[in-house]
């Protein structure tokens, strides 16, 4: 909210836009964002983190498929080999030994579709309302309201419980949600949804590296190989279009 007020509030007042249309799409965006978060959090009660990581990375495949077949967004040929590499890297990184699909895994898979639509909807909203900080601000506000209803209905929320986890909640609310998704919206002004999905697969890479640095978690040779494959996929998806434009005058 402070970033929105400082950087975009005055600019928005000068911009002529359809308020009803922007509100409608932002409402959908915030609701999808809220539902994706709910499914991700609840799924961890019924599955382990490794399985969750494997099935969440499915949005790397889902985003280009939905983009192309539903929204008719052009997909650069470099995306498909990059998607394949991301899936292989994600499997190696998680080192899942049990591939039985459980209830929690199903929630993660459904959540992957919501995360995919979230990436695409940000892309669509930016086409009609190119104010990424405002979009990020109001999607978080709507998602917060959306998530509060099931939280109050199915959980016992008390000030005492909140105070015990206040550091984690502030980190998740301010940095993981506020700042991170603001940067995502800002970056999507120039990136396609499929490219964003591939770059997001780096989440598992950073989680493994910081788990090794901060928590002394063992980083096996297989995980290191998975990290290298995902990095290769991201580099490939970004450099090939640039190379094609430079040498052949097209993307």
Specify the residue positions occupied by each region the protein language model found.
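C-terminal transmembrane-helix exit sites in multi-pass transporters
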Residues: 2-8, 59-81, 205-225
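C-terminal-most transmembrane helix of multi-pass membrane proteins
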Residues: 5, 165-167, 175, 201-251
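Helix-helix packing/entry segments at the starts of transmembrane helices
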Residues: 52-58, 122-144, 177-213
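Hydrophobic transmembrane alpha-helices of multi-pass small-molecule transport proteins
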Residues: 75-95, 112-115, 147, 222-241
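Hydrophobic residues within alpha-helical transmembrane segments
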Residues: 24, 28-31, 58, 80-85, ...
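Structural signature of hydrophobic alpha-helical transmembrane segments
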Residues: 41-59, 103-114, 163-175, 228-230
């Amino acid at each position: 909210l402070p970033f929105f007020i400082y950087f975009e509030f005055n600019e928005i007042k000068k911009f002529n836009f359809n308020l009803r249309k922007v509100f409608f799409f932002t409402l959908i965006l915030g609701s999808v964002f809220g539902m994706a978060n709910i499914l991700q959090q609840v799924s961890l009660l019924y599955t382990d983190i490794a399985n969750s990581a494997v099935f969440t990375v499915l949005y790397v495949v889902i985003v280009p498929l939905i983009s192309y077949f539903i929204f008719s967004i052009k997909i650069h040929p470099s995306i498909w080999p990059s998607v394949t590499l991301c899936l292989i890297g994600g499997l190696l990184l998680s080192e899942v030994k049990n591939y039985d699909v459980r209830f929690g895994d199903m929630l993660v898979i459904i959540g992957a579709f919501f995360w995919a639509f979230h990436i695409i909807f940000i892309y669509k909203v930016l086409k009609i309302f190119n104010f990424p900080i405002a979009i990020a601000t109001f999607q978080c506000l709507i998602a917060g309201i959306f998530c509060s209803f099931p939280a109050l209905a199915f959980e016992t929320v008390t000030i005492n419980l909140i105070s015990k986890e206040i550091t984690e909640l502030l980190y998740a609310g301010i940095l993981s949600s506020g700042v991170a998704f603001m940067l995502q919206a800002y970056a999507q002004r120039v990136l396609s949804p499929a490219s964003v999905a591939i770059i997001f697969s780096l989440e598992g890479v950073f989680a493994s590296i910081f788990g090794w640095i901060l928590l002394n978690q063992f980083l096996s040779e297989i995980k290191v190989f998975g990290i290298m494959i995902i990095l290769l996929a991201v580099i490939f998806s970004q450099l090939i279009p640039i190379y094609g434009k430079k040498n052949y005058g097209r993307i």
